[in-house]
């Protein structure tokens, strides 16, 4: 999983533990580890949600000011399906 530069340090510190992604299909899998900094994130869950499920509180938990801010970043390519990805940072990597 890739994160914008401003989100990387909060993810590493454990302040952000979920991400909303708009894809055609999931690009990650539960249990998968993805490099970030000197460690990696391990995906603990992924589930499809609706746009109406993206609340201001969920946007803040994902590291954004609000829903509009999140939606500007969440869309990757032509996808229209919304996924909530939960993860934990593993400082020792993969």
Predicted features and spans:
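Mixed-charge, low-complexity intrinsically disordered regions
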Residues: 1-94
């Amino acid at each position: 999983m890739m994160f914008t530069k401003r989100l990387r340090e909060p993810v590493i510190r454990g302040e952000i533990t979920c991400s909303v992604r708009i894809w055609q299909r999931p690009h990650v899998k539960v249990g998968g580890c993805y490099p970030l900094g000197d460690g990696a994130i391990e995906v603990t869950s992924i589930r499809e949600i609706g746009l109406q499920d993206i609340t201001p509180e969920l946007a803040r938990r994902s590291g954004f000011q609000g829903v509009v801010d999140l939606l500007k970043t969440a869309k990757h390519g032509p996808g229209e399906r919304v996924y909530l990805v939960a993860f934990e940072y593993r400082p020792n990597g993969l």
